[in-house]
Amino acid sequence: MRFRLLSLLVALPPLVLGAVPSPAEDPTARAALPEFQFIPAAAPAALAPAAPDRADLKAWPRSQGDNASRRYSALTQITRENIKDLSPAWTFRAGDGAANIQCTPVIVDGVLYAPTPGRALVALDAATGRELWRRSLSDDPKSNRLQDAPARRGLVYWPGDAENSARLLVGAGDFIYALDPKTGAPLAAFGTAGRTPLPTGATAAGVVFRHVFVTTGLSGDAFGYDVRTGKLLWRFRSVARGTDFGAETWDGPRAGANGWSGLSVDDTRGLAFIAFGAPRPDMVGVERLGDNLFSNCVVALDILTGERRWHFQDVRHDIWDLDVCAAPNLLTITRDGRRVDVVTSLSKAGHLFVLDRVTGQPVFPVRLRRAPVSTLPGERTAPYQPDPELPAPISRMGFDPADITDRSPEACAFVEAQVARSTHGFFQPFVEGKPNLYTGSRGGAEWSGAAVDVPTGRLYVTSNRVVSKITVIANDERPRDPKFPPSAGETLYAERCSSCHAPARQGLGMVPPLLGLKARMTDAAVEEIIVKGRGVMPPNLVSDAEQRRDLVDFLQRRNQPPSRSGGGGPGADDTPRYFFDGFGFLNDHEGYPGIKPPWGLLNCYDLNTGKILWRSPLGEHPELAKAGMPTTGAHNLGGASVTAGGLVFVAGTADEKFRAFDADTGAELWSAKLPFAGTAAPAIYEVNGRQFVVITATGGGRVGGASGPGDAIVAFALPLPR
């Protein structure tokens, strides 16, 4: 085993691009590199000393719980001993539609605030669920690029100051709204008529520090606004360009590094920690050679100025869609007897890194393994990728044939046949025309992130174990010759589809690409999605039948004007172009994951040591349980919250159950059936001395559920004394 120790640094020096690359990478040169490199851990004495924690740990003013994104409650009324008595206290039904809502409610002074499927924000009496007010934020459909609910993945309450009133800060479409918490009315002094533009679209919950509201954009970048006036104070580009630090790590078109994952704030040091996702386009990097900063990074910014303090990159030149996917968690741990402040980085690759808050240096050594080369002409893979030992990965990137399902002989044979036709391995690049198998595009971790037990330094994170099955195919499509006018279908696409799927059909944020659609979907399947919608896409996008045919023709590349001359696809040069066939998965003949369970997990880490304390299956397939199969776990998207009562609450599974686990042992102590699947992390709060646990339960989206999508919010509590 050969390895090389790197000098002390936050991340490897970026790959600087120069001459035009040769058609294919040299495997011999790659094999000559040391097998391992290491980023050494910071000396314990050099780690940032713990600062006072000023958060009110019994409050829930932000969807992530507090500015540190810990989703922790110090309330203790509900315990391991009485959890069996927990039951629904009230259920709210929005009554304005049915859609997947991914926002954890905010609760302040006995009032709960949450979005609805009908693109409104509601205020409820947190003790009874009675509606107090409702405010629509969908007056301008063109302003909402996702055409879905406001506060997609969170909102925040700011209490105001001596001169300015309290406000709810809500992202919706391409705007940030400031609303009066008492009435829902827009606050006129904020921006124009209560809203201010967010250039790259809203998704994650922002954070307020002093007078600065920090948020991120769906399609990238971070922004600092004056929380009092809505004035834009600064903008940090997540895709480095021009004279930016890291601009040399891109060659060609620059896109991605989306901001849907989330952010957190150190209230003492004035630092914002922001997670940015994968570069674009997904799966193919021939047009974006280099490490592609600040994709797949946690970036620390000075909140008052927006200046970068440090960054830590996980996967470099990502061609697998392995986003750093969740809000960084801020916590305090013990190292060599000292209490120190750290921040986490979670990714779909299954990596969990623990970093010093001030310098970004890792708390535990980071092992990097030599990665294989690509055979795609024009592709340039990073020579090393993370292969961490401590903390152990949530899941291992790649695929091991030893994991093939043994659920039945038929299931095993069906999966073995797929594996025989596929590639797989540690950061295995795509081979043209062959499916590539790896664990990652649905996690590992996901956007729902983790919860922190503040006193102990434990971290609770949900994860998925499903194998992606994705094929990269040569792209022979070329753009329309500008000498000819667009077709009717292209015009419709530009008007109604391009804000989500991007002008060149390459996809945007969480929205998939439509390139190469003719190779993977029939006309009927495309038209069905246009009519019925899918995920966040609304139904009846085009109601006129003739217009639908025009749009399908454009998407399937039929009856279009002549293409621009030039080789290789949609560009004017001869750079090879590719597309991928969508986000497929390795499943058996009955649609179950093609690997051995567990398929979904709740994981507990002790971050003082970096070790896993326990792992418990999360979710089940009821029909398999009835057949006698042990708890399998299931694909999940929801996230956990933890209490001082020793309980971890979590939903997010298609079996539509809400569960509580013992925080010390991982034993499942309680569950309840929801009207629809839970689709966000729960919030914990207290009203008049009574503790509640509330969950958004709408199903739909990637969670699914037999009953969804729906429109419910359900609050649980112990019975009132008789």
Each PLM stretch: what is its role?
Residues V20-T76, E379-V415, S565-Y578:
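N-terminal pre-domain segments of enzymes
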Residues N82-G95, L121-L146, A162-N164, F175-T200, ...:
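Extracytoplasmic/lumenal domain signature
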Residues V212, L271, K483-S487, T491-S565, ...:
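Extracytoplasmic electron-transfer domains, predominantly the class I c-type cytochrome c fold
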